[in-house]
Design a protein with these regions (language model features):
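Flexible, solvent-exposed loop/hinge segments and secondary-structure transition points
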Residues: 2-228
């Protein structure tokens, strides 16, 4: 019996060491992330849309899929109107803290939006770039919405530096699978998404169960999505 307890304690100690080693590795190498290349960004958009199912695709395949099914547009965030593709990103302004829930520090008037077409060129999704500062880093994601502009079809984080096994679980399929069908705005088109850590009895269409042990990351995800 005593031998069994020793084995259990040894295994627990070993797991703790592995966890600490992972955290140390993360802290040492988190600064090495660089701005994603065009191919990486294209791949992330295709993953978010569901057109790309795995990472085992060459650059040519990614480029062909992107050119065939993705239509990049620019939108004026102040007016909500489409603008010409050759309009440069202008009019960036600093944000006061009380008007900067996503902690992005400045916002540009012109932003990119990606439309996903089917084979008959009918729009199937509207993909919004979402980013904001959370617990450990600025996280970048693509948020595909139904053409109604309210209903989530997926949430795909493609660059983040959150703590392994905690905030970094924003990329886990087990957490992401609850997003399809959620609403990001209410019937009055006001931001309404909630991410809760309290595991409510009834999770409605506006509520997502947060990541256990990663309250700051969960709150940051909520703020950044509601901002954009």
């Amino acid at each position: 019996m005593r031998k069994g307890k020793v084995i259990v304690i040894s295994m627990m100690f070993f797991c703790i060491l592995i966890f600490i080693a992972a955290i140390v590795w993360f802290m040492m190498y988190q600064g090495e992330l660089t701005e994603p290349t065009s191919e990486e960004k294209y791949a992330a958009i295709l993953h978010a849309s569901g057109l790309l199912k795995s990472d085992e695709h060459d650059k040519k395949t990614i480029k062909n899929l992107y050119q065939r099914y993705i239509l990049a547009r620019k939108v004026n965030l102040d007016s909500g109107e489409w603008v010409a593709d050759d309009v440069q990103t202008q009019g960036c302004k600093k944000l006061a803290p009380e008007h900067d829930p996503a902690k992005i520090h400045q916002r540009c008037t012109i932003a990119d939006v990606y439309l996903v077409k089917d084979k008959s060129n009918k729009i199937q999704q509207i993909i919004l770039p979402v980013f904001g500062e959370v617990a450990k880093s600025v996280m970048y994601a693509f948020l595909p919405l139904d053409p109604d502009g309210r209903t989530v079809e997926n949430l795909y984080y493609y660059q983040q530096r959150e703590t392994p096994f905690l905030g970094a679980r924003v990329e886990d399929e087990s957490w992401r699978k609850q997003w399809p069908g959620k609403k990001v705005v209410d019937n009055n088109l006001m931001p309404a998404l909630r991410i809760t850590q309290e595991k409510p009895e009834n999770i409605d269409e506006y509520t997502v169960d947060g990541i256990s042990g990663a309250t700051l990351t969960s709150n940051g995800v909520e703020r950044s999505i509601n901002y954009w």
